[in-house]
């Protein structure tokens, strides 16, 4: 009868283990798709689409050199490795929190040897003896007020926040690499245009000088074209410096020195363009893609869970335990 009462009590305690005392989560309702897609598609529907943006969005440029630079940057960035290490730490904390749901088992073992003095030993009796004892203790915390489940949920949200932080670093690295490559290509294109204009102005200057020599143009026309030519030529070193800065940034992002940067990285002289319409999705998808928003949401959920854990600590902890042992001597 006592054993049956114990079993019923244990089952009742387990049934009540869902009585968490933490605050309820209230998630904001997402806006309707019609309210969020309009601002993105009302201007020019042939430029953007409502399709979701792919994770490897830089491949939309269809540039193998850019793909290789992004892969190198992701592999060389130390901030990403640190973010991954923080994810591993959060994952280990989650495993530790989940282990609190399992019973705790302790094993004990002992052995003893004894020898009785001869004057205390009856005739014919053995003077030596050995003893062995084994035991096991089992304890289990009944999660009556949600302390254990709250810790698990908080650790799970911490892991999700760490994953979002790692995604944010990856997004930043990819964006910086793509921007540096685009700036280098754009600067190269501007240099080509500036040099072409200078060449045209040189031809115009030669023709104007000849006309001036035969009296068909005055000196003011020659001076004006010369000034335009010099002004345009003066912009070339500035643009070349911008291109060099972009290539230096690419070298830094990919973990190389400027001298080690492959020459092919700076050969493109055509600005980057996306041939197909740009998939942007809607406002809800845009917010869902932002890692900083996801990280903030997960940290808020983790803090909410910890409020419940703190409240559960104010209540008694219920632990079920049992032990068994055996001993033998000879």
Each PLM stretch: what is its role?
Residues 2-75, 132, 156, 240-288:
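Terminal intrinsically disordered/low-complexity segments used for targeting and assembly
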Residues 85, 89-92:
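Membrane-embedded segments
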Residues 81, 101-128, 139-168, 187-188, ...:
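Small/polar (Gly/Ser/Thr/Ala-rich) solvent-exposed segments
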Residues 295-315:
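Long hydrophobic segments that form regular secondary structure
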Residues 134-138:
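Membrane-embedded beta-strands of outer-membrane beta-barrel proteins
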Residues 148, 157, 164-282:
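Periplasmic alpha-helical coiled-coil/stalk elements that build and connect Gram-negative outer-membrane
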Residues 239, 291-292, 298:
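Metallo-beta-lactamase
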